[in-house]
Amino acid sequence: GDIILPFKNYCRERITLEIEKGFITGIHGGFEAEYLRDYMKYFNDPEVYGISHIGWGLQPRAQWTAMGLHDRNDGMCMDARAFYGNFLFSTGPNTEVGGKRKTPCHLDIPLRNCDIYLDDQAVVLAGDVVAPEESKAR
């Protein structure tokens, strides 16, 4: 049920990413992992494997199911990136967040039902935002 953008598909198999020092060093699983590996390899650029940014969805009106309800060529799948409680994991360029990595390959991977901790403080548990009240925007 996780989503890989720009592929605009719901994953139906487990894909395991090995990450060391901020870079993907291995992609394991079945067909979907092979598809992801080949897509990233095509760019022939080690920077495509770099982690660019992370975040989590806060929009209660965004729907995880929205991508399946529209033509694949319509829109940018913003619901997939924003639905409440997702963990958004991204690879590739990071210049928009102050980094220096430039590469044409960018993946956004919204993950469902994750547990996210920052400095040992729970932020998302099983897809529910539990960040401390003082850290939430008003």
Located regions from the model:
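Metal/cofactor-centered catalytic core regions of large enzymes
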Residues: 1-138
